Amino acid sequence: MTSLRPPRPTRRAVARSALALTGLTALATTAACSRPVVADQAAARESRGPVTMWTSNNEQELAWGRAIAEAWNAEQPDEQVSLQEVPAGASTEEAITAAIVAGTTPDLLFAVSPAATTDWVRQGGLVNLSDFEDGAAYIEERVGEPASGYAHEDGDYYQVPWKSNPVMIMYNRELFEAAGIDPDDPGMETYASFLEGAQKIVDSGASRSAIWPAPTAEFFQSWFDFYPLQLAQTGGTRLIEDGTTTFDDPEGVAAGEFWAEIYARGLAPQETSTDNAMAVGTTAMQMAGPWAIASYQGTIDFGIMPVPTQDGRPAEEITTFADAKNAAIFTSSRHQRTAWDVLLFATAVEQDRTLLDLTGQMPMRTGLLDVHPQYFEENPAYRVFAEQASRVADVPTARGSIEIWQRFRDAYVASAILGKRGVSEEFSSVAHDIDDLLGAGS
């Protein structure tokens, strides 16, 4: 099926089958005995030489990667960077896990999914960046307080938080106006007022649907419907905190029941869109990050607002899903010192500006608006995302994270989207299952 969202630079479609998930788990189990980790990691950490860097396969990030490689290579003739895209696969997470098993990982990856890092570390696939003398300090200085959310369970860093796509609600201003909603001040901050506005959109005939999240069961889809609302409602409480699930508490259930009401009223379709639904006018809203601006700019007159909360938190208090992609070095790298230097180079202020110019995605850096004022002055549509980027949370660092998210997604689809079971009962049941899984993995 075709994704309802415009082509998204940070994610590929993921096969939902149980076989694929079982295969991923099997890869994680067998990888430790088949990866070609460099035997002398201490020597590799100080070694310099040519390195390979992988990025996502979308045009914007490949353009950024080429710019980084060319700039580096012009100054470092003996430590050249070769750029490749992540190999095709069901998902980036599965492709990298398979590469760890096969021994084909690059030195550097600029497409790290935080959901997969804990298992990759347990496989022995990622270099501990805190072992570099300036590693932890650099990460914490660059990212600030949110950096702690990307630390491994041992407190060390195996990834550098690189870029985020804070999830907000983009809407078609023309369709809002047609429905009698003020596009400059929609007044849809609460669950109740959002439902009221969504009902107006459909009842007025302004659009076939009010909002159209992907109703499919891939593990990551909850990051773009339920999870931003849980984070917003709780001030940033993640799906798992301190080794225990949180989503079956009153705030999580309220977020799930909000979406259940959306679907029960027919305000969001239960099928997948076959085109860019908001661009063609078959829906009025989408959950999206700054990556989507390029898809709508010049096509529709759009607005941006925070995700709703039960009682309407002020915009400046809303936390949403970061949708981050990060950078890491693999233990198969023979020249980890060069890889680290390239990583530092690629995440410097100058290269952050290149990232903004080429992708519109938000560098994970404190004071982003102050660091790049000219960019946001020249590109005001991105400013609201930059403001939101300082208030984000990501997926929890947990063993078996992808399986956990898949179990949650299956329960969410059955209850909130399809209405086969009540949200509260289904959330409680799957929370017990996931807690058992977390306990077994500890």
Give the residues covered by each predicted segment.
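Extracytoplasmic "Venus flytrap"/periplasmic binding protein-like
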Residues: 71, 75-142, 178-180, 284-285, ...
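A structural signal for short loop-to-beta-strand junctions that line the ligand-binding cleft
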Residues: 98, 106-107, 136-176, 315-319, ...
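Extracytoplasmic/periplasmic solute-binding protein
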Residues: 153-162, 167, 177, 192-244, ...
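Glycine-centered hinge/linker elements that transmit conformational signals in sensory
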Residues: 196-200, 241-270
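Long, aromatic- and glycine/proline-rich binding clefts that accommodate carbohydrate-like moieties
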Residues: 357-410, 414
